[in-house]
UniProtKB/Swiss-Prot annotation:
Protein name: MYG1 protein C694.04c
InterPro entries given in the database record: MYG1_exonuclease
Domain of life of the source: Eukaryota
PANTHER family in UniProt: METAL DEPENDENT HYDROLASE - RELATED, MYG1 EXONUCLEASE
Family from the record: Belongs to the MYG1 family.
GO molecular function: hydrolase activity
Pfam families: MYG1_exonuc
Native organism taxonomy: Eukaryota, Fungi, Dikarya, Ascomycota, Taphrinomycotina
GO cellular component, one term: mitochondrion
Amino acid sequence: MNNLVKIATHSGTFHADEALAVYMLRRLDRFSGAQIVRSRDPQVLDSCDIIVDVGGKYDGIKYFDHHQREFNDTFSPKYSTRLSSAGLIYKHFGREVIHAVLPQLKINEQDLETLYEKVYQSFVEGLDANDNGISAYPAGLKPSFKAAMSLPEMVSSFLPAWNSEKQDDQTYLECFQKASDLMGTWFVRSVEHYALSWLPAKTLAREAILKAKDSPILIVDQFFPWKGHLFDIEKELGIENQFKYAIYSDGKAWRVQAVSIDPTSFTCRLPLPEPWRGIRDEKLSELTGIPGCIFVHASGFIGGNQTFEGALEMARKALDFPQN
């Protein structure tokens, strides 16, 4: 560990983006234990090893500021959100940081790229947008409530109070370090979730989809969160809208679920037949001609059967139902 290594960022009010940027750098061996220098003095900044969110320069090596008039860099061409210092550091060092957070992780290059982008998309991009004043929603929409506990607002809560007697640089540095640790805690949790839970689930979902071949029925024969992956994998494989129903166990019985038109919609590609909706147990079995029926939801988005074979038959009959 080299105690002379210095990470510089600006003095004064701090924000979530540089708090995370500094945390990510400090996870790397070459910046582990680095001194944090908070200044706007060009000579002080230039004496440091790496400079984030200040300095008016970006070279991808030492200088990582995004405030220049001409700066319009994004994470990749598919993104429109301009990078903040968090996105800049993640873009250049994110793969290394992931390995530093999870040194035991055995992962191939393709999965690393998937994880690298997912963490940006789900965690870092929101900080980039916030720091650049980009709203997630169109202007003019009136929010239903005030969400006062976003990460940027949590970071702001570490700033010394306006009427505090302690307004010196050392106090601000100590507060910044606490804010950086907070951002690091949530960043690590995000990386762990996507690496250890989300990515393995995507692998299983892909296997189930490939096993289905050209069938419109997806069979999920073990428990894992598959719904969020279905649409991405369909798109990756060029088979959008192939699946109409998914069969899976709820631990006691089997469910047949109509696939929605997109991940956030309640509208289904092919709801279960209207005459089945709201009917239960023996009446439903008599109506469908399928033993073991438990229910069909009133909206037709899901139904249940006591056996896998029964749930599968419900899906098959629903596909052939004339009113659908």
